[in-house]
Amino acid sequence: APGEKVTLLGSENIRGWQSVASDIWKVTLPNTFFGDFNPYAETIRGDWFTRVDREHHRGAVYLEGEWLWEAHSLDAVFRRPDPVIDQTDFKPSGEPIFKLHYLEIGEGNFVRMDDCTACEGPELFKREMRTTELVNIRDGHWAKFPQVDFAAGRDFLRVCANVLVGGYIDLHVDGLDGVAVACLPVGTTEKREITSTFEVPMAEQVTGVHDVYLRFCEAPVPPCPIQPPAEGRMWFAEVAEHDTTIWAQFGGVDPNADGIEINVRPTVFYPSQPGIDYITVRGFEMRNAATNWAPPTAEQPGLIGTQWSRGWIIENNVISHSACAGITLGKYGDAFDNATSYPAPGLSADYLNGTWAFNRTVERAAVNGWDRVGHHTVRNNHIMHCGQGGIVGSLGGVFSTITGNHIHHIHYQRLYKGYEQAGIKLHGSVDCTIAHNHIHHCALYGIWLDWLTQGTLLCGNLLHHHPDADILFEVNHGPFICANNICLSSTAIHNWSSGGAFVHNLIGGRVRRSSDGRETPVLKPHSVEVTGLHPIPNGDVRWYNNVFLSEVDMAPLNEHYLDSIADGNVHGHTAHHTEHEGHAVVMDSPPQWHLREASDGWFLDLEMSPAALASVPRKAVSSALLGRAVISVQAFAQPDGTPFRMDRDYFGNAHEPGNP
């Protein structure tokens, strides 16, 4: 009936729970209950997934609509102590264990490596982008950072690091033997060029200003380095030959009276084969799916997904609690799925090289109807609480429009690692429009556009509270346009691509730049026809009329392999090397800004001088000004190929015609 709420679930209500200890219950179900798919026997796996020394199952247990944490052992559910790790024979390798980019002691209280005044062992290294790292950190080394303000107390320690061997950071105040405030495990990772953040609550509260000492040690990584918070409730399952037993904590709730849901289905709405075109899914609540990891080299089932089809409309839905991906605009499956991590017998060893493998994925897509899929519309959905990504797609989302979605709390449990976690993660966003989305509290990134971002328009999005960056452009040749976005995380933009135009953005955090030797495809303009492969050099980037609220260094513009341009940008304070750009404005003092949530939405309070903003002329940005991307030789334009002109602001108000 009109106005009725319709909910589609991948879960079932389970009763028959038996109390086995204080606040611990169990239920045993015959395996026939699950049919051909038992999510408690199926582990999350796939290319570019790292399980972090334990298994992660596709099943889940829900109390009052929220999922419990999967424990790494039955002992953990009963809150028995973890087995002690035998370190009697452990000897440090002598290798560097990680390098540090910055510390964050409480929200927004950053300590930079430049602030280090004394150390034994590590070295300070200033990178091309003019940020300083602490490098060559080995077991037993230490570093001092003076006069750090703990104010009335800070609640967490967060570090940004490249992990090599892995180990621990002990934070002491007022001396190496002073009060131990935090011990942070900085785990291992398989991809050293990607920067990760690590966080731990403060073990002791201190106030006021103190000298901070970091002591570094190499150590074996414990079986489960990430645990749920103290209030987190856990579950654990064992699958035997004939039945499955689930133990869970319910926080004083009687599960037989309240009704407990458990995952039983791999998806909620997903076609059984490719090529099911022109489907509209509108106005549903869809949740609780036992999805698998959705990497770019495999079929990508989501809680709802299109599976290599054309012309879907997914709008006005509430989508939540997918074990991995919420909405997928993904590729078909074939014999080469996940071959980078799990090569089938007889496959070439070249598949172990991820770049080689994905280039072959693109080649196969071209002969499997890549030009006949995509053109989807994903709009006005509320997407939350998904383990991997809110919207995910490899190649199958070309020529699509993604607008007006609210995406938040993606990969927030962070029980595992990988390289596919974001609010929106697309490979091959060819001629896509991604606009007016609100994305926050997602790990690792808000929006991650990886490979084949060509003809893409990213416009009018609000992004904040992302640990690695609001937006990452990885190994693309462009052209792509990033315009009218508000990016407020500590790192706003990480540009690992050429051929980008950044226009009229409000940038609250840092800007990172990277280059790459990987050779990735270049396409014929406004098509999916591959014309060649090319590495990712520095440069061919345009920065017009942006407002930088934080420190940014423009010197690398003069050092790029390919020419880059900056003009008409406003720098909040402590900008560096603005002589490399035209018509730059540097404010006399840092702009004051605060993002706040209220009952009727999110609000940004920002104080800036209108006179300073109007003090220099700025150019109207258009296709004529932006020109063509060097490598793809494609004009900067709208996704449909029509000329681009930036004549309106984030709210849709017209720019001043003489000085935008």
What are these regions (language model features)?
Residues 9, 156-160, 199-201, 211-215, ...:
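Residues within well-ordered beta-strands of beta-sheet-rich folds
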Residues 660:
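A short, polar/charged loop-to-alpha-helix boundary motif
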Residues 91, 101-222:
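Extracytoplasmic
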Residues 146-148, 203, 272-274, 307, ...:
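Surface-exposed loop and edge beta-strand positions of immunoglobulin-like domains
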Residues 63, 173-175, 331, 409:
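Residue-level signal for short segments within beta-strands and strand-turn junctions
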Residues 269, 291-307, 323-376, 382-622:
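Glycine- and acidic/polar-rich repeat regions and solenoidal domains
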Residues 6, 57-59, 155, 165-170, ...:
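Short beta-strand/loop motifs in extracellular/secreted proteins, especially
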